[in-house]
Amino acid sequence: MVAVQGTEDPFYYDYETVRNGGLIFAALAFIVGLVIILSKRFRCGAKRQHRQIPEDGL
């Protein structure tokens, strides 16, 4: 196949930009995950209250 000059390949990707975007997305997802996990573990000193299931409610 002969490539026609003056036309750009529509499937050419700037892999450095794609890689940097992926790394930024992965870092943000990791940080959000840590925040979610730590926010459930530390409740600012609040004691956990367990719900009691009434025996007749089953």
Curated annotation (Swiss-Prot):
GO terms for biological process: positive regulation of sodium ion export across plasma membrane; potassium ion transport; sodium ion transport. Highest levels expressed in the kidney and spleen. Restricted to the basolateral membrane in renal epithelial cells and varies in its level of expression along the nephron. Coiled coil: none annotated. Keywords: Ion transport, Membrane, Potassium, Potassium transport, Sodium, Sodium transport, Sodium/potassium transport, Transmembrane, Transmembrane helix, Transport. It is a single-pass type III membrane protein. One of its GO terms (molecular function) is sodium channel regulator activity. The chain crosses the membrane at residues 20-39. Pfam families: ATP1G1_PLM_MAT8. GO terms for cellular component: membrane. It is found in: Membrane. May be involved in forming the receptor site for cardiac glycoside binding or may modulate the transport function of the sodium ATPase. Belongs to the FXYD family. Regulatory subunit of the sodium/potassium-transporting ATPase which is composed of a catalytic alpha subunit, an auxiliary non-catalytic beta subunit and an additional regulatory subunit. This is Sodium/potassium-transporting ATPase subunit gamma. It comes from Bos taurus (Bovine). The lineage of its organism: Eukaryota, Metazoa, Chordata, Craniata, Vertebrata.
